[in-house]
Regions:
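Active-site-adjacent structural elements in enzyme catalytic cores
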Residues: 1-211, 217-218, 224
């Protein structure tokens, strides 16, 4: 099957509210229309995942940010220019069009542009942002090949786009841009050092928040939240 036909069929599944395993550079994602509450519900059901867990929206490029996010800071575009497409998810304020079911009840949403040309083409063709957690049953290892997805999820989803093995093999790095300084929420495929180099200062959350700046020498401890 030619790529154009495969892309069209995959996009149609997403538009119709179906579940589609899609390749990215990190791990395979379980994709659905992120604006369709029923489709999003099917993600949680297929994975056995709690519905209060936020999902990441995947888009083909940074120009889509203002469709789904409010008050997008200049920092987001700077990071996108430097690291997108790539394993970086940015937390931003969501617009009302993004359902709370997608964001786990939060007024913020994670946005990512995957570094996989076929998946970006599918999203572009579908014309909707794709909510896509890892394509595996909750509690099992993330899948890095289409065969792994087939073994775990077959019978629960409507299709698998085989894009070969994932290059990175770990989830995306997540940074919250709704706070100052930006805060690392999850380490992943993009190293923390790259974010510090781009932003100058990043807060890292653990039991006590550690603030790192670009000198790599200055560390200040902040009170942890309750």
């Amino acid at each position: 099957m030619e790529d154009k036909e495969r892309i069209a069929q995959a996009a149609d599944i997403l538009r119709r509210g179906g579940l589609l395993a899609i390749p990215t550079e990190t791990v395979y994602g379980l994709g659905a229309n992120g604006l369709d509450e029923n489709a999003v519900l099917h993600i949680f059901e297929a994975k056995g995942r709690p519905q209060d867990n936020p999902l990441i929206l995947h888009i083909p490029d940074a120009s889509w940010l203002t469709r789904y996010c409010e008050d997008v800071p200049e920092t987001a575009y700077r990071l996108a220019e430097r690291f997108w497409p790539g394993p970086l998810t940015m937390i931003l304020k969501k617009k009302p069009c993004v359902p709370l079911r997608t964001t786990g009840g939060l007024e913020t949403v994670g946005m990512r542009c995957p570094d996989h040309a076929v998946t970006r083409a599918i999203i572009e063709k579908a014309g909707v942002p794709v909510a896509a957690p890892s394509a595996n049953t909750s509690g099992r290892p993330s899948c890095t090949t289409a065969e792994h997805v087939r073994e775990d999820m077959w019978g629960k989803i409507d299709g698998i786009v085989d894009g070969g093995p994932c290059e990175v093999g770990v989830e995306s790095t997540i940074i919250d841009l709704t706070v100052t300084p930006p805060q690392l929420l999850r380490p992943g495929g993009l190293p923390l050092e790259s974010l510090i180099d781009a932003l100058g200062e990043v807060t890292v959350e653990d039991r006590k928040s550690t603030r790192l700046n670009s000198s790599h020498r200055s560390l200040s401890r902040m009170p942890s939240s309750a």
